[in-house]
């Protein structure tokens, strides 16, 4: 039975100064909800404004680039053949498969034509979905055929608008990455504006629309944004899973759309390896990211009909090596400073050796030689011996694969980007060095200190990741100009993050003993705002001039050539010539090619060198036999190659062929002593004299100021 009794008297509890009294607590309870609600409201409002600005600036960038493309070519007014010719070199080759899919009677026949293609390389049937990264063209062609837009939008506009739309995604992803790092969307706005004002050095989409990197880099930027968020500490399990999904999807799409994906992700894996080794990143999160890279590559490999070049990539070998060695090498992150250093050096050596061992084993098992030209090029580029290899020299002599020109930094400095970037880089490198030393030192005493007080110098994992990322991609850009677009876009993100980062300004103010929250707040907002105002003042007149400058596509010689081929040659005719021109022939005429610009195949590289003997010192009988061995009916000679002056002596195409053939080069200057004079004159020059020995094998059927087309006789 329940009773009610008098409550026992209890002693009053002394309230500490750190805790409010009951009366004060009641007052706080009345105040907190409104304060929390107000803070939450401003946070939601700020996020809404920041998100709206991100979408707007992404769309504006897309429209801006599309307008520049239209103004430069007058794309809406030129003929279809001129539009297709404007897709130069390999861009035209990729677009031709989009066109091929649209022209196929059914989607099934279109797929069959790509899987069993016999027009891209004569006398061969190749699987284009295995050889090339063209799933994006397949996807777009399917969308165009399925969606009810044929009456309102031409296929070419659907294609280019998709690419310009991806630029909006790209800029938005850069914006979000900078916002995540700094904690303010003002940083994202500054990053996006820097990207636009440094357009010459951050993108080339407006004049190389179908290029693989223009498809891939937006997904790469999304992946970096997702990784930046994933590396934040104390994420909720649901947020972590959703972020991992975003990383997986973006990594997969990046891998699917660009053949150089494995090299970019190898640098990312190195970033993770460095941070994990220096204890600046949670080991489990690094493991997740290694696993995502491997699984995405294997999935792409499956979709590309088990492309052996993917299986033999250094990335897969490296990631497997890291995971294996880390499992075998126990207690890697314990001990004194010197002990940790020795363990780390051993770890590096084991991973490096195991990577080379696994990669060599895989390549021998698969008999993989498709990527050997890349390693020959790298070996020659970094001074590990001269080479006469035609393919390696072809890359070495291209400006795009040379060192980054110094005038790039001059242009980047005009918008203050380079100055801001170097300022932030120096501060964060010093911070990272201190943190790395702290982590590698004897951890027992330092960890006890951390339990009582926060470190004076610290670097968040997401900031550390972006720091090492920008350093490694900077080294890549400095060594190979073509890769600068990977660095300069991230440079915008990193510089804007630093200017808006409270951690960066706090560290600097501490050094001069002027640190307080108000000064930090003023600097992190005042400096970016002043920079934004300067950018608007400096760049607005130039942007207006660009938008008002109207040009027009003009290439009458190439238009005349394509029109003649369409009207005067059989549809099954086989054409030989330069890789760049033949891509246009494939797109504009649908004729069969002997070779093309997609260079990631050993047999194709050998065939290209054989076809290029038309610019070497070879007899007409030799050239005729080589061309006929590939089923050639017509050969196109270009004066711009035969009499080339763009490159210096030793880098002209005819010089590369002469050296590869063991012949002395033309023109003033010395040749290597073991090179000998050729027995025959240069074919592309001598054939124009119409001598009997040439006329017996080649008949000129077309000529203009740029091109000469010869029909091959079928006699042996």
Curated annotation (Swiss-Prot):
CDD domains: Dpy19L3. It comes from the Eukaryota. Glycans are attached at residues 118, 704. One of its GO terms (cellular component) is endoplasmic reticulum membrane. Residues 65-154, 257-262, 307-308, 360-414, 486-487, 540-716 are lumenal. Residues 1-43, 183-184, 198-215, 231-239, 280-289, 324-338, 438-465, 500-522 are cytoplasmic. It is found in: Endoplasmic reticulum membrane. Residues 185-197, 216-230 dip into the membrane without crossing it. It catalyses: L-tryptophyl-[protein] + a di-trans,poly-cis-dolichyl beta-D-mannosyl phosphate = C-alpha-D-mannosyl-L-tryptophyl-[protein] + a di-trans,poly-cis-dolichyl phosphate + H(+). It is a multi-pass membrane protein. Pathway: Protein modification; protein glycosylation. One of its GO terms (biological process) is protein glycosylation. The chain crosses the membrane at residues 44-64, 155-182, 240-256, 263-279, 290-306, 309-323, 339-359, 415-437, 466-485, 488-499, 523-539. Keywords: Endoplasmic reticulum, Glycoprotein, Glycosyltransferase, Membrane, Transferase, Transmembrane, Transmembrane helix. GO terms for molecular function: mannosyltransferase activity. InterPro entries: Dpy-19/Dpy-19-like, Dpy19L3. Its EC number is 2.4.1.-. Belongs to the dpy-19 family. The C-terminal luminal region is essential for C-mannosyltransferase activity. PANTHER family: C-MANNOSYLTRANSFERASE DPY19L3-RELATED, DPY-19-LIKE 1, LIKE (H. SAPIENS). C-mannosyltransferase that mediates C-mannosylation of tryptophan residues on target proteins. The reaction occurs on the luminal side of the endoplasmic reticulum and involves the transfer of a mannose unit from a dolichylphosphate mannose (Dol-P-Man) donor to an acceptor protein containing a WxxW or WxxC consensus sequence. C-mannosylates RSPO1, a Wnt signaling regulator, preferentially at the first Trp residue in the sequence WxxW. C-mannosylates the netrin receptor UNC5A, preferentially at the third tryptophan of WxxWxxWxxC sequence. This is Protein C-mannosyl-transferase DPY19L3. It comes from Mus musculus. The gene is Dpy19l3.
């Amino acid at each position: 039975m329940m009773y009610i009794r008098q409550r026992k008297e209890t002693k009053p509890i002394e309230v500490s100064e750190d805790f409010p009294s009951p009366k004060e607590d009641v007052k706080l309870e009345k105040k907190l909800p409104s304060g929390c609600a107000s803070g939450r409201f401003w946070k939601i409002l700020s996020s809404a404004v920041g998100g709206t600005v991100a979408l707007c600036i992404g769309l504006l960038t897309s429209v801006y680039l599309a307008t520049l493309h239209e103004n430069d070519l007058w794309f809406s007014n030129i003929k279809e053949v001129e539009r297709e010719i404007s897709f130069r070199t390999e861009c035209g080759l990729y677009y031709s498969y989009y066109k091929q899919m649209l022209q196929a009677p059914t989607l099934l026949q279109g797929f069959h034509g790509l899987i069993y293609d016999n027009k891209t390389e004569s006398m061969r049937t190749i699987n284009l979905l295995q050889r090339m990264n063209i799933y994006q063209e397949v996807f777009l062609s399917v969308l165009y055929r399925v969606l009810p837009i044929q009456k309102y939008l031409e296929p070419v506009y659907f294609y280019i608008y998709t690419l310009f739309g991806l630029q909006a995604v790209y800029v938005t992803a850069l914006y979000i990455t900078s916002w995540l790092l700094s904690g303010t969307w003002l940083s994202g706005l500054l990053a996006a504006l820097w990207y636009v004002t440094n357009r010459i050095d951050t993108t080339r989409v407006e004049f190389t629309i179908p290029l693989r990197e223009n498809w891939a880099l937006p997904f790469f930027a999304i992946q970096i944004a997702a990784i930046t968020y994933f590396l934040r500490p104390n994420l909720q399990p649901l947020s972590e899973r959703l972020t991992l999904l975003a990383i997986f999807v973006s990594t997969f799409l990046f891998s699917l759309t660009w053949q150089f994906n494995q090299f970019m992700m190898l640098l990312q894996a190195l970033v993770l390896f460095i941070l994990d080794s220096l204890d600046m990143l949670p080991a489990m999160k690094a493991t997740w990211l290694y696993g995502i890279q491997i699984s995405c590559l294997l999935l792409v490999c499956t979709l590309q009909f088990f492309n052996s070049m993917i299986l033999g990539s250094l990335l897969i070998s490296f990631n497997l090596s890291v995971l294996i060695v880390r499992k075998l090498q126990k207690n890697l992150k314990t001990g004194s400073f010197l002990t940790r250093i020795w363990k780390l050096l051993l770890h590096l050596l084991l991973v490096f050796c195991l990577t080379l061992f696994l990669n060599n084993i895989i390549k021998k098992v698969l008999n993989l030689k498709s990527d050997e030209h890349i390693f020959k090029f790298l070996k020659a580029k970094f001074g590990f011996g001269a080479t006469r290899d035609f393919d390696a020299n072809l890359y070495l002599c291209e400006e795009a694969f040379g060192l980054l020109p110094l005038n790039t930094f001059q242009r980047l400095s005009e918008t203050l980007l380079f100055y801001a970037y170097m300022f932030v880089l120096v501060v964060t490198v010093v911070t990272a060095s201190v943190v790395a030393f702290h982590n590698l030192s004897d951890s027992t005493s330092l960890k006890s200190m951390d339990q009582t007080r926060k470190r004076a110098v610290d670097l968040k994992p997401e900031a550390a990741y972006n720091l090492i990322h920008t350093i490694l991609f900077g080294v890549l850009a400095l060594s190979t100009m073509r890769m600068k677009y990977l660095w300069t876009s991230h440079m915008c993100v990193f510089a804007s993050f630093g200017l808006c980062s409270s951690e960066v300004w706090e560290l600097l103010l501490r050094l001069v003993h002027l640190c307080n929250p108000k000064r930090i707040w003023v600097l992190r907002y005042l400096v970016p705002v002043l920079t934004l105002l300067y950018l608007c003042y400096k760049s607005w007149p130039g942007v207006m001039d660009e938008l008002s400058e109207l040009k027009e596509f003009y290439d009458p010689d190439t238009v005349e050539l394509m029109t003649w081929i369409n009207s005067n040659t059989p549809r099954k005719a086989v054409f030989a010539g330069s890789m760049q021109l033949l891509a246009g022939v494939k797109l504009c005429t649908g004729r069969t090619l002997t070779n093309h610009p997609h260079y990631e195949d050993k047999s194709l590289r050998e065939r290209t060198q054989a076809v290029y003997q038309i610019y070497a010192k070879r007899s007409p009988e030799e050239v005729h036999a080589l061309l006929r061995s590939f089923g050639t009916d017509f050969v196109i000679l270009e004066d711009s190659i035969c009499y080339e002056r763009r490159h210096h002596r030793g880098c002209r195409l005819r010089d590369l062929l002469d050296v590869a053939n063991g012949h002395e080069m033309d023109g003033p200057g010395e040749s290597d002593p073991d090179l000998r004079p050729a027995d025959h004159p240069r074919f592309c020059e001598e054939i124009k004299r119409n001598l009997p020995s040439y006329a017996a094998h080649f008949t000129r059927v077309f000529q203009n100021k740029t091109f000469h087309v010869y029909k091959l006789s079928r006699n042996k």
